């Protein structure tokens, strides 16, 4: 007996990238040229990550991965960079309960290597060593987002 993964003639799920683009890119080096001089210790780097998804049609979605990195030496900003990197994805054939994980885990996972390279290039071009952002656990980020939304819904559901 052969395995049949195509139940009831339904199309198998597909996820494809139709386009990728830089939506917004900013790099600030407010202390240049002093910030480029050798320093005793490496600056502290804080990185914030966000993912947004918006429908364009029944099957096409715009997913934007936002990376914000700031390097500080004490209270002085050494550099600050922001990137909004987007992709237009065609998502078809997935059960409804899998749509949010696909949009908020798989799509940003596909965008991340390109966004990481842009951040590395812009920091290098700004006169610093390239900032190589560690891989991001989008599954954990999505789980945290869902937990926060559920907690917020509970608080809003409690009568005053």
Swiss-Prot record:
Keywords (A to Z) from UniProt: Chaperone, Cytoplasm, Protein transport, Translocation, Transport
One annotated GO molecular function: unfolded protein binding
Pfam family, one: SecB
Localization in the cell: Cytoplasm
Organism superkingdom: Bacteria
SUPFAM superfamilies in UniProt: SecB-like (SSF54611)
GO biological process: protein folding; protein tetramerization; protein transport
Gene Ontology annotations for the cellular component aspect, listed alphabetically: cytoplasm
PANTHER family for this protein: PROTEIN-EXPORT PROTEIN SECB, PTHR36918
Function description: One of the proteins required for the normal export of preproteins out of the cell cytoplasm. It is a molecular chaperone that binds to a subset of precursor proteins, maintaining them in a translocation-competent state. It also specifically binds to its receptor SecA.
Assembly: Homotetramer, a dimer of dimers. One homotetramer interacts with 1 SecA dimer.
Similarity remark: Belongs to the SecB family.
Protein name: Protein-export protein SecB
Classification lineage: Bacteria, Pseudomonadati, Pseudomonadota, Alphaproteobacteria, Hyphomicrobiales
Encoding gene, per UniProt annotation: secB
